[in-house]
Amino acid sequence: MASPYNAGEIEQKWQQRWAEWGLDKTPIASDLPKFYALSMFPYPSGNLHMGHVRNYTITDVIARLKRMQGYQVLHPMGWDAFGLPAENAAIERGIPPKQWTEKNIAQMRAQLQQLGLSIDWEREVATCAPDYYRWTQWLFLEFFQAGLAYQKEATVNWDPIDQTVLANEQVDSEGRSWRSGAMVERKLLRQWFLKITDYAEALLNDLEQLTGWPERVKLMQSHWIGKSVGAYLEFPIKDSQEKIAVFTTRPDTVYGVTYVVLAPEHPLTKVVTTAEQQGTVDEFVAMVAKESEIERTAEDKPKRGVKTGGIAINPFNGEEIPILIADYVLYEYGTGAVMGVPAHDQRDFKFAQDNNLPMQVVIIPDDADNSDVNLTVAYTEAGVMVNSAQFTGMASPKAKQAIIKFAEDNDYGRAKVQYRLRDWLISRQRYWGCPIPIIHCDDCGAVPVPTKDLPVELPDNVEFSGRGPSPLAKLEDWINVPCPSCGKPARRETDTMDTFIDSSWYFLRYADAQNTELPFDGEKVAHWLPVDQYVGGIEHAILHLLYSRFFTKVLADRQLIPVKEPFQKLLTQGMVQGITYKNPTTGKYVPAKDLQTGQQVIDPKDPKDPDSGEPLQVFYEKMSKSKFNGVDPQEVLAKYGADTARMFILFKAPPEKDLEWDDADVEGQFRFLNRVWRLVTDYIGDPAGIRFAVRPETLVTNEPLTKAEKDLRRAIHGAIKEVAEDLNDDYQFNTAISEMMKLSNALIAATDLISFPVYQEGIETLLLLLAPFAPHLTEELWHRLGRTDSIHQQAWLQVDPTALVLDEITLVIQVLGKTRGTITVPASADKTQLEELARNSDLAQRYLEGKTIKKVIVVPGKLVNFVIT
């Protein structure tokens, strides 16, 4: 009897040996074509979850496959290591963020290595390491020197009790601080921005080049950039030199403007508010300041506003119109002001009704009568201009351009393209982030830290209270420095950078991770970039992927790198979902373990709440701790081994689809690997693995192959062909595994009449196809077959077309179009021969006897149909 499959022992053995061999190191120089396989790097939370396992397994299979296909492969890993959780740990547990993060990295690195990932760990990066963020700061200064980094006032989430800025994720659904419970306010602070809007058009247009990206992701980015073509118009304020600027995509409606609205935060709010309205306006501004952006712009929420008492002039018709402030207008969007055209915009229509504002119709349908217009809803379609001075009677689409020209000729405004995309606010009032390398001098302004003084390192002597300003803002010894320009006393910038900055260039660092002189060498970037296959979740479709594209374009324009797009192909893997139990009455989630009481297991088809006895809803949902539906990868690895976990992840669903965790299917993959183990060890014929078979280098033999051998070779090369097609572009791992299962079944079913060379070819083919998927098992069996080199260094298999040629085929016999049965005929038979073979077959004779054949229809390789009378 063969030795049993001991996954844990085998996996530990080969992980150690691969590390000793340096099997996964990136080739330093090679004439082979390159392939850069990359997974989005993780935040080091301390433990892998199944989403991680899926992401990194997918990329690993691709990397292993490409090595076997003759590519030099770069497959690195690192850590997106700055962020709020480490700072929270410091507050809650008294653990310094650096210590907490490094411990988590070590733990997760070990877990990744247990998965058997073929990662070049010599290129590992951690964004919190000074030798990494030194170069993040260097790149920031490149943006600063290019005029792409600047400061301006911006609203932030402000905790009035803790006196600190909060990230969006620290504000709960009721608008309260996660820590103090206070209602969060909106407050203006001076913040750092990157001018991503300068690249809006390039980011939008170059989406067309990304043919290897999912259309869904490109559409999401296009919508996020949000290009609008329209007009910039200015409305003078009565009795003032100031003007209110608005952007509109409907300049054809300008004669229908009956009011203008400012964002409450707009600087002109103070200018236009009259003494009579000051109290009302102040009260409204204070109320809106407590609301989040999401609350203010929610579609289902009534739009609230108040009059300021100020008056604007519509320059097109000279009419005086009221100026209001409203919660739905945001200062950060566009100009921070909008023109109100209630007759032709539904939101304006409702707002005008609620605030008793007038309406003026200026466009009517082509077939409408202007004498009797009674609006019940806004008319938002194209039509004929009315009540619009010299533009009356003109078709509204044509009037758009005419009105823009009129505005330009009279200095009322101009044509303008606007984007929904806003400049990237990168300031964070946090400690655990990359320090912004700027020194503020009263005389010189914002002065960049000299390159020789980088990195500006995070100080260690920090107290974390969770209250007040950023911990860095309290360290006077760290803050107070001489100005690099004039030498006078100055102060360091105490904000740190958004962690998305760190992840916007890490893929460039992997190309040259040990460089101490530059963030990367341009020639090495030219060799490895763009990333050939990027793998990560759809949740990063906009921010991370857009910011990475932005960084790449800026660095290309700075002539630091030769590529303008970072990722050639993108695979967004689906979520891993767990079975979830929920009480529909209380909304409470119930852990699966609670469905068992003592030895009595509750019927899984009709589960009840163990507390109330109510029926539970059962469905699949993304794994999370709060829903009690997660599966710990470490438990799966301990029970089944990494190869089984990998196989299940790859087999259960196509990579871009959501995957429903199923213990029974995990068992199924474990059984399959056991079957492969027994198949090969039985073939070797020695349970101790002492007597090894010798691999023949050729199938040439003096004897012709038997039918059974030909059938097996056809199955072997059919599997090679199908797996190659499954892994060609779309990486359909699940169907590739199905083909391997078919081949294993063919090998198991093969009779003793199969010769040694043919069976050996089948065994080796199965192992080579399976190697990228189950690397440990296949390596062990490969060596038990007598090989001394790694299976992962073997060339990918090529199809032998002659093996796929059929000697015989099955031919369908039909009479009057009805199938009567099948016969076996030579595959080489032509139409005449097929007709003769069919006509003379016993099967056909039974139906043709005594009949007159009027016509014979022959479809070569498929059927013969007799038309009789």
From Swiss-Prot:
SUPFAM superfamilies: Anticodon-binding domain of a subclass of class I aminoacyl-tRNA synthetases, Nucleotidylyl transferase, ValRS/IleRS/LeuRS editing domain. A motif ('HIGH' region) lies at residues 42-52. GO terms for cellular component: cytosol. Coiled coil: none annotated. GO terms for molecular function: aminoacyl-tRNA deacylase activity; ATP binding; leucine-tRNA ligase activity. Keywords: Aminoacyl-tRNA synthetase, ATP-binding, Cytoplasm, Ligase, Nucleotide-binding, Protein biosynthesis. GO terms for biological process: leucyl-tRNA aminoacylation. A motif ('KMSKS' region) lies at residues 622-626. Its main location: cytoplasm. Gene3D superfamilies: HUPs, Isoleucyl-tRNA Synthetase, Domain 1. It is found in: Cytoplasm. It is an enzyme of class 6 (ligase). It comes from the Bacteria. ATP binds at K625. Its EC number is 6.1.1.4. It catalyses: tRNA(Leu) + L-leucine + ATP = L-leucyl-tRNA(Leu) + AMP + diphosphate. Belongs to the class-I aminoacyl-tRNA synthetase family. This is Leucine--tRNA ligase. The gene is leuS.
